[in-house]
């Protein structure tokens, strides 16, 4: 006689109604093993590190720990978000596939610029947006907002959460002031890490604030740029500065509106003075 063992895997409730084990078959299963989501970020990081395809051929990959934390935090935040369908859930496959996409985008950038080190950035997480939306089912409210909008908000909130673990006590006023004075910087894949680093070094006090991430003068450009972008993304997440979709960092929108309003008010005052002077001159000519 043959000894046959059957192992079945199914979600308790699947939105497609195809994943449930039929009752006659379930009655013949000896044991039911109930699993659960990772209980904390570090447990999720360990699972993702074990399962994700991270070892690439001919690539010197270095994944900063804060990138791992943000990716896991996205899953944790999505599980608590009211706009995400709790019945379908958010499985550990989300951070696993996201990590693979993040590494792939970083690897593409390194190959494009012939760089030795592959170091993922926060921008690579946003580049993985299509993969994240494919792993999440939304409630009605989320559908009305749009999947991309909901996921961007979750990523932004996740960056803010992890940012606070490193920079909660960091004074960023000097950096904010640089942007308030009209400074802008763009970080994208179009230029190598050395070029991005040269632009970032122009921001007063930025590189010096990266101490919590163990960045120093000997750190390679790829790692330094990734850390600096994380700090800027955290400031953007807390609305201390602004960022456009083209990844151009500028002054906070409120500061920009205040500046525009002040400039407008100044122009109006100048026009009033010109009108008063014109009226006075016209009056004088009338009496001559």
Model-derived regions, located:
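C-terminal engagement/docking regions of AAA+ P-loop ATPases
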Residues: 107-288
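Signal for well-folded cores of large energy- and translation-related assemblies
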Residues: 20-21, 26, 30, 34, ...
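Short, surface-exposed, charged/polar-biased interaction segments
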Residues: 27-30, 42, 46, 50, ...
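Conserved AAA+ ATPase small/helical "lid" subdomain
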Residues: 44-119
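Amphipathic alpha-helical transducer elements in NTP-driven molecular machines
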Residues: 3, 15-26, 38-45, 61-72, ...
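Generic preference for well-ordered secondary structure
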Residues: 5, 9-13, 86, 116, ...
């Amino acid at each position: 006689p043959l000894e046959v063992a059957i192992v079945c895997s199914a979600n308790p409730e699947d939105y497609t109604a195809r994943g449930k084990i039929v009752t006659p078959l379930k009655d013949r299963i000896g044991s039911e093993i109930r699993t659960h989501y990772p209980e904390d970020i570090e447990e999720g990081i360990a699972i993702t590190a074990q399962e994700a395809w991270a070892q690439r051929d001919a690539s010197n990959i270095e994944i900063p720990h804060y990138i791992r934390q943000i990716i896991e935090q996205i899953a944790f935040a999505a599980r608590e978000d009211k706009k995400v369908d709790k019945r379908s859930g958010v499985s550990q496959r989300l951070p696993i596939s996201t990590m693979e996409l993040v590494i792939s985008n970083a690897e593409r950038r390194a190959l494009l610029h012939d760089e030795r080190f592959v170091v993922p950035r926060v921008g690579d997480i946003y580049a993985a947006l299509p993969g994240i939306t494919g792993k999440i089912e939304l409630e009605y409210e989320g559908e009305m907002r749009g999947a991309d909008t909901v996921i961007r908000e979750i990523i932004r909130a996740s960056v803010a959460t992890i940012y606070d673990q490193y920079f909660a006590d960091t004074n960023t006023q000097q950096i904010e002031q640089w942007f308030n004075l009209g400074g802008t910087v763009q970080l994208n894949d179009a230029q190598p890490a050395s070029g991005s680093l040269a632009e970032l070094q122009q921001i007063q006090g930025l590189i010096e604030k990266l101490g919590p991430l163990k960045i120093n003068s000997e750190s390679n450009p790829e790692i330094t740029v990734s850390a600096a972008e994380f700090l800027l993304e955290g400031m953007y997440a807390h609305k201390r500065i602004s960022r456009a979709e083209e990844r151009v960092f500028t002054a906070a929108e409120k500061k920009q509106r205040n500046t525009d309003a002040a400039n407008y008010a100044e122009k109006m005052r100048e026009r009033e003075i010109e009108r008063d002077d014109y009226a006075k001159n016209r009056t004088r000519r009338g009496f001559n």
